[in-house]
Amino acid sequence: MFWIKEIKSELQKSTKKMKLVFPEGKEDKIIEVANRLQTEGLADVAVLFGTEAEIPNNLVAGIKTIAIKNNINQEMLNLLLTIRKGRLEEDEATLLVQKRNYYGAMLVQMGLADAMVCGLNYSTADTLRPALQIIKTHEDYSIASSVFVMTKGEEQYIFTDCALNVDPNSKHLSDIALMAANFAKDLKFTDIEVAMLSYSTVGSGSGPMVDKVSKAVNRLKAHNEPGLLFEGEMQFDCAYDQATRNKKYPKCKFKNAHPDIYVFPDLNAGNIGYKIAQRMGGFEAAGPFILGLKKPVNDLSRGATVEDIYQTSILTIYQALQKEAK
């Protein structure tokens, strides 16, 4: 993916090295990626293990290793109890921080890491639960969301939300669109055009599913941020194809042949849509990348390849660097 080269270059030039934690140190794929990231100077990497005996001898110099069993302290427990006040007893907190996904999230919350990549041995829910409970969503947004970066040749688009929110309401949809637009800015997109998708194009259909998209569009247009253009509701053919758009939606203000971002109305549509583009359309799908958290945490597919983990890690490090700069 051509955007990876640009991000790598920016990370290598940065005087500020982000700290990335991998909770799943027992995985050979994680060790390979950790070594690569550290060697290339893309981040300061930390890898978690259960015990000292699990730490391999093939880690490159500079990688920090943490054996959780020997590194649970009262400060961490007290912070977790404060964050989860009224929901946890101390013995429950002690058990939680022994889990690598929770320990990693605590390192991020405590500022000992800037970001986390996890999921080879965890479901998406088990990766995101500690992130949502401990790191929490950013105060600007009502929910967390996800994006896929879809690439084919010189074409590059962002699809959202294809992994997290089952049936977002109009407020959620507007937040999903804004998060994706800000993510696109971080990836150096300019004059960003966002299509709010539906089975209806500006009133050609009706029903609650259409209403929530049109309400989200109205909310977004009131946002009125320079460099961002939101249009809809519209069908996918109208959004993607300029000739169809000219017929179905002549008042649409999109100037590009194709908009940059496609916001799906629910998880059914989004998940099916990105997989059709990937399998039938020949697009490479990078992600999902999680948006809306106060600090970056990204989820890996349990079938992720070394290259998948590497690309996700680079983007996660970059997300952390962008948050540092804001």
Residue ranges and their predicted role:
Residues M1-N256, D260-K326:
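Anion-binding alpha/beta catalytic cores of soluble intermediary-metabolism enzymes, centered on
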